[in-house]
């Protein structure tokens, strides 16, 4: 239950010596025989938790970006272990001295290898809609809400690479980067 998970996380946090902790947790449907169906009803879920000392991303550090065609399957909104395209894109970015790789399908920007990407143009916060082409990030969700709460117009429609290049600001967001501004592309 939510209460049990909360209790477990607080118990683990109490064992950490740092005041700022990065927490990552996953719940699976449980352990079962290798097959393509879900485990039998009543199978106990597995919980995996990773914690380490860590601070929010440094928003004063501006990222260099690169891009590549998004060839991932059509269910990017589902968190899976099928991350090879993301890993290869992150490696490409790293080898080019970039902090992230922007995925696009044709000319339409989707997201980054392990972050969401949004733009600001003429005072409007624009971000890809939460459809099957992106993993809807928690930080992205909070950014949208903060903009709405502060009267900043939000446009959740697809945008193009040309719009990205012409943006007043490009924001890369994730749980680890928080909100990192981008300064350079390719």
Q: Each predicted region: which residue ranges?
A:
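Helix-start/capping segments and mature chain N-termini
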Residues: 3-15, 28, 33-186
């Amino acid at each position: 239950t939510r209460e049990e998970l909360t209790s477990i996380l607080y118990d683990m946090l109490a064992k950490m010596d740092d005041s700022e902790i990065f927490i990552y947790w996953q719940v699976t449907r449980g352990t079962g025989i290798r097959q393509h169906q879900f485990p039998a009803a009543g199978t106990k879920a597995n919980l995996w938790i990773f914690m380490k000392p860590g601070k929010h991303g440094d928003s004063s550090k501006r990222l260099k970006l690169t891009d590549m065609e998004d060839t991932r399957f059509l269910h990017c909104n589902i968190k899976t272990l099928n991350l090879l395209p993301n890993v290869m894109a992150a490696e490409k970015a790293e080898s080019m001295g970039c902090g992230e790789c922007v995925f696009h399908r044709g000319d339409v920007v989707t997201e980054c290898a392990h972050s969401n990407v949004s733009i600001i143009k003429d005072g409007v916060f624009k971000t890809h809609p939460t459809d099957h082409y992106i993993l809807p990030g928690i930080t992205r969700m909070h950014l949208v809400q903060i903009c709405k709460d502060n009267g900043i117009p939000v446009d959740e429609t697809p945008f193009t690479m040309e719009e990205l290049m012409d943006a007043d600001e490009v924001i890369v967001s994730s749980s680890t980067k928080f909100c990192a501004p981008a300064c350079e592309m390719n």
